[in-house]
């Protein structure tokens, strides 16, 4: 019996140490307590690489929002990375939570709505999206892993990706790990990726049905639903035209207009022509984004 107990303890010890290490570092601030790694470092490492950004960012935000839910949220993709929620709050006098996730797609955005709706008495929901997000080719999963890890302390402490993030945070704090920067060929890379996305475009009626279900819930609960289409550079619009996507874009915009209040800044327009106002063809400069924010929340 004693030998069996010792064997069990020896087998369990490495797992206990791993779980203890994860709890100590607390890579996604689940326990919201002291950690040897500063909060700023753990938050910065959400953007460590393009491969991990979707999972890491969504995990962090699911945990953070559950701890302190608010009534107004904006849900979207990487184009909300530089979105200044504090600027919106300074205009409206209301807290706004930014649920923007790099790599976010329509399924994850709509599931985020239901998650937030389960935790808060929502009053205003802004959905930042774009034509590219409404293709059936964009129906991939980034939700399940983060949602599982955020669901309980046991899940959190035993999740492989949480362990990986804890190791990353430790190396960033005590070592010399550096986050990926913006590559010199960022523009060309984004354009190439966007062409591949647009070439695979196919209507996604199940996305439309789920959006209508969200809109129905908003009407039922008295939630104001606003859809925001941020600017993209005209090089994207030229590709859309070249690929014959005009009818698909028109149908997409009609769906948005018929479902909720629709703020369409996507272009083509004067603000989508100036390359200097863009980090790459899909992502605006902070200055241009702040101008759009002021137009939406303050009016012309």
Model-assigned labels for residue ranges:
Residues 215-242:
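Active-site segments of SGNH/GDSL-like serine hydrolases
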Residues 70-71, 94, 121-124, 219-226, ...:
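Loop/turn elements at helix/coil->beta-strand transitions in domains of secreted/extracellular proteins
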Residues 1-69:
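N-terminal secretory targeting modules
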Residues 124-221:
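Secreted/periplasmic serine-hydrolase-like ester/acetyl group-modifying domain
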Residues 110, 204-212, 243-253:
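Well-ordered, non-membrane alpha-helical segments in soluble/globular domains
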Residues 68-152:
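Membrane-embedded segments
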Residues 243, 247-300:
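C-terminal regions of proteins
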Residues 98-103, 197-204, 239-242, 278-279:
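Second-shell loop/turn segments in exported
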């Amino acid at each position: 019996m004693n030998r069996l107990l010792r064997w069990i303890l020896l087998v369990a010890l490495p797992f206990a140490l791993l779980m203890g290490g994860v709890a100590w570092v607390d890579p996604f601030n689940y326990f919201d307590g002291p950690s040897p790694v500063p909060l700023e470092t753990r938050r910065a490492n959400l953007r460590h690489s393009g491969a991990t950004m979707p999972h890491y960012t969504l995990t962090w935000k699911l945990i953070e929002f559950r701890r302190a839910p608010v009534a107004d949220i904006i849900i979207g993709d990487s184009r909300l990375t530089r979105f200044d929620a504090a600027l919106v709050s300074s205009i409206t006098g209301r807290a706004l939570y930014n649920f923007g996730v790099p790599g976010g797609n329509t399924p994850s955005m709509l599931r985020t709505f239901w998650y937030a709706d389960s935790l808060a008495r929502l009053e205003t929901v802004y959905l930042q999206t774009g034509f590219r997000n409404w293709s059936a080719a964009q129906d991939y999963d980034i939700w399940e892993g983060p949602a599982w890890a955020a669901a309980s302390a046991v899940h959190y402490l035993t999740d492989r990706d949480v362990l990986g993030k804890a190791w990353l945070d430790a190396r960033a704090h005590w070592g010399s790990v550096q986050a990926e920067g913006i590559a010199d060929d960022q523009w060309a890379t984004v354009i190439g990726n966007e062409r591949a996305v647009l070439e695979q475009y196919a209507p996604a009626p199940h996305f439309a049905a789920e959006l209508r279900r969200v809109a129905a819930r908003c009407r039922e609960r008295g939630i104001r639903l606003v859809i925001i289409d941020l600017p993209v550079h005209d090089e994207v619009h030229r590709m859309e035209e070249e690929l014959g996507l005009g009818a698909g874009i028109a149908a997409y915009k009609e769906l948005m207009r018929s479902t909720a209040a629709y703020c369409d800044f996507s272009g083509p327009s004067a603000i989508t022509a100036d390359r200097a106002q863009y980090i790459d063809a899909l992502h605006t400069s902070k200055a241009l984004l702040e101008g759009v924010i002021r137009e939406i929340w303050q009016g012309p």
